Each structure stands twice: as structure tokens, then as C-alpha cells.
Amino acid sequence: MRAPPKHLLEPLNPRQRMSLLLIDEVPDRVVVYPLVTAHAATIAGISVRRTVTEGKSMAIAQLAAQRYYKHDALSVFSDVGLIAEALGSKLYYREDDVPVLQQPVLEHVEQGQDLSLPEAASLPGRYEVYIEAIEMLLREAGDILPVMVFIPAPFTTAALLRGTEDFLVDTLLDPESCHRILELSFKAGLDLADLCIEAGGIPMLVDPLASASVISPKTFDDFAVPYLKRFSDYLHRYDFDVFLHICGRSEPILHGIRRTGCDLFSCDDVSLELCRSRIGEEIRIIGNLKPTDLLEETPEKIERKVEAILAAAKESPKGFVLATGCEVPIGASRENLLAFVREGRRRGMYWGKEE
């Protein structure tokens, strides 16, 4: 009889490891969670288009990728336009890449007052893809792996209802109408989160268009933070720890991250030492290998970068998750991602010696 794979001989399984982190206990090692989303399609030999339009295909791809890389969580995610599409925006579907905005539903910002919330129970748009994927992943691996579900946050959804550039101009010229669109986006986000929680998923808010690479700190404070805070308050009623992911530059908005109410912050382009010093006493940090490194570097360089990341943040006071700063690129080197996970597990030990 063959011995079980080494990753199954660890003291804790991934779900136990994440659970200890979330109750402020020290797990056996750092949670290793590269954001493997559309890249999973390449491992399963399925088109990206199928994984974002078929729940079963998404789940099959996630399971195949996790078996291959041995990372610590599964990810249910298609694209940030999911809610905007359900509210009427049109997306353009590509065979081997994620959908992109083709036509926002709002030609003028004032039209936001005419938009209505779809009936969540009818699973508008592609919501059924999410629910089917969550249910299948829970059946197949939910006892040992957390099933993370990426929920587009209100600011990002609002921008995709209007068109990002137009919406940013609108925040200056007609903030009142922008807040009406944000309120609708917030309520639609809650509806999707409810469905995903009821199916068994763990929500993670994703707000890429609220990045300091896109908007100013003032716009973040005025138009993103209030809705993230209300979303966090809502999820806390479920007794969930709130995960928030904002890619791109984060340093200019770190002051506002605390006010979002999140419990875990997934960061991208920011010094982990700075992140740790500013928010690490209150918020668990998730990060932050540059996704492009998985395309451009060698496995040996990835190992050195993981070592540096862990040196900077492994002992963050509230806790740390080793992750990529954003989604793993579709064409990422498999050898590089294997090196990332392997080195994270080896150097991320808290109990006893390194593997």
C-alpha cells in the first residue's frame, strides 16, 4: 500500500488551519493561498469561458488545481462584472480569458434611480454558476478545504454599471446620483452574499476598482469605505470574519482599511512591513507575491521572494496568510506556482521545525 501524500500528513488540514487563524490561535503553519481562479482552467484542460459560465466546470477546475498545487483553499470566482451583469450591463465573453465589460447599463448617471434590484431567488445572470460550484466543491472537499467565494464590492459594481471612467467623473459632478447607484450595488451584493453563504461558501469582498491605482484616497473614503463598512457589519451578523481584497496600490488607502471593518485584508502593491506596522495589530494580512512574478521569474527566485515575504509578515501580530497579490495569471508557470506553495509550506511553520 502506498503512503498517503506528504501534504495529508500535516498536523492540520487546510480547513482546520484556517479556522485556527480566524479564532486568533496559532496554526501549524501559515495558510498558503495563492488566488487560483481562471488559471485553474489550464490545469483541468477546460476553457476559461466554460469555467465562468458553468458551475460544474468551475468546480472541476478548482479541484484539479488544488490537487496539483496543494494550496489551502478553493476559490469560486468568475469576474468582477458578475453583479453588474445581473443588473443589466453587457459583458464580452472570451474563450480563454475572463469576461470584460462591453456595454454598461447606465448611459447617464441619473438613470441609476430607474434600476431595480432583481429577485435574488431567481438567480439572475450567472449567479447559478456560483451556487452550483459552491455546492459541488462542498460535496467533494468541503470537509477539508475552505470554499472562498469572491463577491464584487459595491464600488466596483457601481463602476461597471456606469463605465469606470464615467463613474469616476460622476463622483465629482453628481455624487448624489453615484450614491444611489452604490446603494443599489450594495444591496445586490448582500443578496449574492446571502445566496453564497446559504450554499456554504465563505465570502470575500473584492474591490479592485477601489484601488489607489484607480482612485484617490478621498474618493476611497467618500465612496468605497461607507459601503464596505456596512457590508462588513452585515457579514459580522453571520459571525463571519470579513475578507477584503483590493489589488493594485494600497499604501495611500491603508488609513481607511481599518474603517472598512474587515478582519483580513488581501493586499497587492504595498510594503508588507508598512502594512504590518499600520494595520497588523487589528487586521490579519494576506499577501503579496506579485502575480507577474509567476510569469517572469524562475522557481529559485520565487522561493527567495517567498522567504522575504514570510520574513516580513509571518509574525504579524493578528496573523498572516501567504498569497499572491491578485489572481494567479492564466498563463502562470506551473513550476513557479509549485515553488510558491512548496516554499510557503516549508518556511511557514509555526509548530516545531520547518518541513
Where is each model-derived feature located?
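A contiguous, low-structure linker/loop signature
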Residues: D79-A120, D143-I144
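Intrinsic-disorder/low-complexity, polar/charged segments
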Residues: E54-K56, E107-Q111, P124, E176, ...
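Short, structured active-site "lid" loops
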Residues: R50-I60, R67-Y69
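A short secondary-structure junction motif
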Residues: G45-I46, S89
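Glycine-rich, N-terminal phosphate-binding loop and its surrounding beta-alpha-beta segment
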Residues: Q62-K90
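Active-site loop segments of alpha/beta catalytic cores
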Residues: M1-A40, I46-R49, A61, D72, ...
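Residue-identity detector for glutamine
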Residues: Q16, Q62, Q66, Q102-Q103, ...
